[in-house]
């Protein structure tokens, strides 16, 4: 059966129809047993990781911070230094239980293991809400080369809406994981805010830093010719903070701000990866850095990841915080409506750090 399916893909349109329009995703494509990567997934040579300086050695990677350290001042400094110098760090002993993390991974596999007809209920064409979306790649309509990834994206409005609209197969685990990370998020934002002279994370500041939450369940199936494509292309996130749960397979690479080399982020059991998003870079007037990152495709293993994007409310107007520029520091960014920024990000393909040019003065 698989060989028959694999043999039927004679044209680009047939592949696109099977993956995108019929809702099979790249998981379905991978499971047909294809041996050669379809043309529309072949990235330009300059976008393949083999064309970049890559550091796989353990002597250079993002900082690892023990959040449970009783010396809160030293933890805060480590977080802020990492936000300025790397834009990425891993946290351990962060207060989210291993059981919750493992349940989230299991639920992710469970959702993507559903029959295609079940997953398609949450596609762009069939979903009851734009807050719930099953899809593939990033922006297929805008991309010259597709990315080797399927996803379920869930924008959180309320537990009541989630109970009605989110898939049964992963709802409870996703809500629990999201709720369990909130104390960690607030602690990190408090550290980052205090370093910007924000004395208190009051309701106004909360609406800027963490007024909205989106969680994605990502699935990267085994890929033929993984060296020719990407799981996710070069980009920075548009969030304030991103909290990433990755499995043991690995594949996330971050571009070092100091050397420009791509550095592998090795999976650490029980850890969470934190990265600064564009919104935080804008609000900090460039002190904290959102950094290019990307995900490799894998020829041997299926991989999952679950990022939580903590962001301003869509209707918020964001710009450099008054606390940052009140002493005469010149603003680098203009005030922008956050929803306009997000729309700008999603209407194009991944293109490194170019999105933030939208906010430049």
UniProtKB/Swiss-Prot annotation:
Coiled-coil regions listed in the entry: none
Names of required cofactors: L-ascorbate; Fe(2+)
Disulfide linkage: none
Domain Fe2OG dioxygenase: 211-312
Signal peptide: none
GO terms of molecular function: dioxygenase activity; metal ion binding
Binding-site positions, 2-oxoglutarate: 220, 303, 305
Induction: Not induced by 2,4-D treatment.
Keywords for the protein's UniProt record, in alphabetical order: Dioxygenase, Iron, Metal-binding, Oxidoreductase
Catalytic activity of the protein: (E)-feruloyl-CoA + 2-oxoglutarate + O2 = (E)-6-hydroxyferuloyl-CoA + succinate + CO2; (E)-6-hydroxyferuloyl-CoA = scopoletin + CoA
Cofactor note: Binds 1 Fe(2+) ion per subunit.
Family statement: Belongs to the iron/ascorbate-dependent oxidoreductase family.
Name recorded for this polypeptide: Feruloyl CoA ortho-hydroxylase 2
Species in which this protein is naturally found: Arabidopsis thaliana
Gene: F6'H2
């Amino acid at each position: 059966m698989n060989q028959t399916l694999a043999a039927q893909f004679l044209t680009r349109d047939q592949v696109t129809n099977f993956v995108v329009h019929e809702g099979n995703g790249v998981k379905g494509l991978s499971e047909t047993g294809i041996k050669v990567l379809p043309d529309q997934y072949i990235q330009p040579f300059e976008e393949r990781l083999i064309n970049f300086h890559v550091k796989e050695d353990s002597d250079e990677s993002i900082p690892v911070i023990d959040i449970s350290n009783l010396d809160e001042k030293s933890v805060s400094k480590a977080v802020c230094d990492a936000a300025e110098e790397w834009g990425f760090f891993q946290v351990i002993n962060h207060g989210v239980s291993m059981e919750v993390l493992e349940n989230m991974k299991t639920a992710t596999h469970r959702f993507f293991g559903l029959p295609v007809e079940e997953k398609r209920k949450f596609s762009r064409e069939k979903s009851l809400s734009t807050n719930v979306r099953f899809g593939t790649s990033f922006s297929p309509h805008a991309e010259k080369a597709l990315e080797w990834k399927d996803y379920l994206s869930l924008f959180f409005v309320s537990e009541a809406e989630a109970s009605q609209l989110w898939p049964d197969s992963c709802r409870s685990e996703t809500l629990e994981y999201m709720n369990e990370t909130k104390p960690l998020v607030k602690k990190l934002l408090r550290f980052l805010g205090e370093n910007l002279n924000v004395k208190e994370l009051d309701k106004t500041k909360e609406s800027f830093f963490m007024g909205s939450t989106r969680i994605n369940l990502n699935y990267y199936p085994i890929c033929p010719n993984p060296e020719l494509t990407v799981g996710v292309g070069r980009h920075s996130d548009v969030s304030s903070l991103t909290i990433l749960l990755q499995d043991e397979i690995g594949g996330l690479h971050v571009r070092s701000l100091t050397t420009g080399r791509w550095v592998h982020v090795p999976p650490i059991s029980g850890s969470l990866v934190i990265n600064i998003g564009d919104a935080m870079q804008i609000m900090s007037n460039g002190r904290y850095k959102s950094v290019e990152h990307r995900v490799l495709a894998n020829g041997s293993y299926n991989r999952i990841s679950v990022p939580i994007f903590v962001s301003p409310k869509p209707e918020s107007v964001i710009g450099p915080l008054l606390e940052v520029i009140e002493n005469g520091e010149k603003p680098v960014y203009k005030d922008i409506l956050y929803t306009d920024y997000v729309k700008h990000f999603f209407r194009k393909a991944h293109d490194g750090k170019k999105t933030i040019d939208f906010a430049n003065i």
